[in-house]
Amino acid sequence: MKALLIAAGVAALSSTAMAAKLDEKVPYPKADAGFTRQVIHLPKQDAEDAFKVEIIAGKTLEADCNQQRLGGELEEHTLEGWGYSYYRLDKVSGPMSTMMACPGQKKEQRFIPVVGEGFLLRYNSKLPIVVYAPKDVEVRYRIWSASEKVEKAVSE
């Protein structure tokens, strides 16, 4: 009897975990051909309004000593009937680069970020951040937090 209760408990927990993961993605459309759907699940924070999420999309490319960037815009879309936001990075241009001489330096594989508008998002641990990006683009992220110290401007 005890073994049966343990087995039933394990089965219930595993099906709940699977259902929770699937339910979070159900309303979001599948990725179009040539795109991937990349998902970020944020941990709950106290005072989430003091946090932001920076989306850092990019590609790993061979690069020299110059500063390199890709161009693009992360566009917010709303899931009809649900009101959930998702984000789409349609076009990635570049790379753009500074033009310094790099004598004697070998090129190496580096992560080159996409810069543009829309990459700083509100922190909300209740919903996943869903990003559709071209297949050759990797999505990374960074959490920003505000200092509790607030400074006062000086009249001049």
From Swiss-Prot:
Description of how the protein assembles with itself and partners: Homodimer.
Gene Ontology molecular functions: serine-type endopeptidase inhibitor activity
Keywords: Disulfide bond, Periplasm, Protease inhibitor, Serine protease inhibitor, Signal
Record's GO cellular component terms: periplasmic space
Site (Reactive bond): M99, M100
Subcellular location: Periplasm
Role, per record: General inhibitor of family S1 serine proteases.
Protein name per UniProt: Ecotin
Superkingdom, taxonomy of origin: Bacteria
Primary localization: periplasm
UniProt-listed InterPro entries: Ecotin_C, Ecotin_sf, Prot_inh_ecotin, Prot_inh_ecotin_gammaproteobac
Residue pairs linked by disulfide bridges in the UniProt entry: C65-C102
Keyword Signal: yes
Signal sequence, renumbered to the chain: 1-19
Family indicated by similarity: Belongs to the protease inhibitor I11 (ecotin) family.
HAMAP family, per database record: Ecotin
